[in-house]
Amino acid sequence: MAIKTESFILNIGPQHPSTHGVFRLRLILDGEVITDLEPVFGYLHRGIEKLAEGRTYLQDIPFTDRLDYLGSMTNNHAYVMAVEKLAGITVPERAEYIRVILDELQRIASHLAGLGFFLNDLGALQTPLLYMFREREKIVELFDMCSGQRLNYNYYRFGGFVQDLPEEFLPALKKLLDTLPGFIDEYEQLISTNEIVLIRTKGVGVLKRELAINSSAAGPVLRASGVNWDIRRNDPYSIYDRFEFDIPTAQNGDTYDRYMVRIREMRQSVRILRQAVKDLPEGEIMGKAPKLLKPPAGEVYSRIEGPKGELGFYLVSDGTDKPYRWRVRPPCLLNLSALKDMVVGWKVADLMAIFGSIDIVMGEVDR
């Protein structure tokens, strides 16, 4: 006699420690195997894009801090770069170098947080997270030196920065760059060959190259699937074309490769930082920008390579001091759209390992 079975619907979230935000997953299971997945988001929607259209261009900078709040510096950069392009504002040489320095520090800090939480989700409770937050804290202290904030920095301005780097910033940064590669080696010794990590991640949650491209995956998620695409190299912005660095990629597209790409990216960020500190010129940190900015009527799209992937801003100006349209292209939302392709066919026990490997921040997804 055949046994009659039925699919089981499992809801995870919207309050769940491994979703790292208010997010719900609706799973359909056959036993323990995931046969379908529906991501349900919007719980953190704040209407940022519409709010931004009712404020001046300058007043909108703090909104960008609150998208991916673990990547605020790069968010600031993407937005001010779009406005500068729209208004024809030139950025001084020193300010461009400082932007590269802050962007790469933010990339390292974001990867440290993402990897720490990912390993926490795997079951390595607290220890790897605290190891990585030990170094992230040093970067947060650098951001605090220049902006006065440990989160939501609001440091970038159209044409440069609100103020120059303090005297103690560069010595502290050089000290960090001397020690950070050794700590990355330590992470690899503890994690990259750990048998439990290998069992939980190798070959798990594979996102094939074609699916990664078709789903518009971005950043480490895309590069782990064998796609060599990085805005810093493929469409250079700021002064990234002056630096020597490699674009880490992998071929398997699994959970382990997404982890390894981020580890290697931190090493390349250190490489860029050393060049930027060595070549940092003296001079002005603020270009000529009007106090009340009214860009000429027109539209612009500007993009950068943030820690999570390609972050873009589309702006439409009607000639007033407020944007007519203010649109964000968030990499976290695009990476989340590929989650179903990664998890179908895997057991529910593997879900959080796969989900943690794409490093989602819901503030950017819901906006």
Curated annotation (Swiss-Prot):
<keyword id="KW-0472">Membrane</keyword>
<keyword id="KW-1278">Translocase</keyword>
<dbReference type="Pfam" id="PF00346">
    <property type="entry name" value="Complex1_49kDa"/>
</dbReference>
<dbReference type="GO" id="GO:0048038">
    <property type="term" value="F:quinone binding"/>
</dbReference>
<dbReference type="InterPro" id="IPR022885">
    <property type="entry name" value="NDH1_su_D/H"/>
</dbReference>
<keyword id="KW-1003">Cell membrane</keyword>
<comment type="similarity">
    <text>Belongs to the complex I 49 kDa subunit family.</text>
</comment>
<dbReference type="GO" id="GO:0051287">
    <property type="term" value="F:NAD binding"/>
</dbReference>
<protein>
    <recommendedName>
        <fullName>NADH-quinone oxidoreductase subunit D</fullName>
        <ecNumber>7.1.1.-</ecNumber>
    </recommendedName>
</protein>
<keyword id="KW-0520">NAD</keyword>
<dbReference type="GO" id="GO:0005886">
    <property type="term" value="C:plasma membrane"/>
</dbReference>
<dbReference type="InterPro" id="IPR001135">
    <property type="entry name" value="NADH_Q_OxRdtase_suD"/>
</dbReference>
<dbReference type="InterPro" id="IPR014029">
    <property type="entry name" value="NADH_UbQ_OxRdtase_49kDa_CS"/>
</dbReference>
<dbReference type="InterPro" id="IPR029014">
    <property type="entry name" value="NiFe-Hase_large"/>
</dbReference>
<dbReference type="GO" id="GO:0050136">
    <property type="term" value="F:NADH:ubiquinone reductase (non-electrogenic) activity"/>
</dbReference>
<comment type="function">
    <text>NDH-1 shuttles electrons from NADH, via FMN and iron-sulfur (Fe-S) centers, to quinones in the respiratory chain. The immediate electron acceptor for the enzyme in this species is believed to be ubiquinone. Couples the redox reaction to proton translocation (for every two electrons transferred, four hydrogen ions are translocated across the cytoplasmic membrane), and thus conserves the redox energy in a proton gradient.</text>
</comment>
<keyword id="KW-0813">Transport</keyword>
<keyword id="KW-0830">Ubiquinone</keyword>
<keyword id="KW-0874">Quinone</keyword>
<comment type="subunit">
    <text>NDH-1 is composed of 14 different subunits. Subunits NuoB, C, D, E, F, and G constitute the peripheral sector of the complex.</text>
</comment>
